[in-house]
Amino acid sequence: MNSKERVFAALNGDPHDRPPVCTPTSVATVEFMDLNNAYFPEANRDAELNASLAATAYTQLGFDTIAPYFSIIQESSALGCDMQWEQKDNWPTVRMTNPIWKNSNDIKIPKDCLSHQDTKTIIDSISILKKQYPDDVAIVGKTMGPWTLAYHVFGVEPFLLGTVDDPAETIKCLEKLKEITILFGQAQIDSGADILTLPDHATGDLVSGEYYKRFLLELHQELVEELSVPIILHICGNTIDRMPYIAETGMAAFHFDSRNDPDEAIRTVDGKIKLAGNINNPTTLYSKGPDAVKEEVFRALNAGVQLIAPECAIPLKTKMENLLAIPEAITDWVAERGNFDVFKS
């Protein structure tokens, strides 16, 4: 069984030889940038550099996925947001204190949205990776959800205030922004993406689970209908209160944060959606060593998490030995339990 087959078997609940280790977001690091001579910000904006850096998840770490969209800002750049590109040891960001739009009437998709350098880089990178690894490993695209796009184009505070002051207008905004999600997602599918990650940051730090149900549940169900590949929803933070709703979306999996107990998460989704995660980034992968990483992997596996992954895009200075500890831990866990080839999640 190869990596792509393993990932799809886990998502579909079919028998597979071991739990897959995946990256729904990013495992790009400064160490891998040095190894490939592919540095931020250029590796976010040049397809060849992007593909070279992304492939290290598979070629150097033995992960079962390759995810070339490292950040969360490519389509926002194409929409005209004010960008801060930073250097190799820092993430590019949108200057959300300088929003480009004020309301739903302002939302316009530029004609060059998909030919813009920062969206085209991802589309072309996926094509490169698909030619290099046609059926060996799962290629994971990424398209921002409408809630995340709203933060970028309206600013976080104005957008969240609008959800209280004028919920109907908020829904109009999200419906229009959803079209960007579909447009960029479909372009990646057409280029060869096997799976899409959908980051939509309606996190418990900012909004309640009822907000998710009110504003996003139906939209996310519509995205599942529109986009023809399995979708992995990603939301940072404490999300237990919205997991029952997320389980109703039809998404293939939910990529969840380490702030959620994996046992509780498994109980909460009640078998209605697969879970990916939830190895801690700042405390464990960045600050501790391989033994601590393996302990967290075992905890997630013992809980029944189907796809093991860092909780989010990893810190750029994460050490390779800690990332290598993730697939090593899975191998050890399976070895302790004997045959795994009849496993069905």
What are these regions (language model features)?
Residues 68-78, 141-148:
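Short, glycine/charge-rich beta-strand/loop segments that flank catalytic centers
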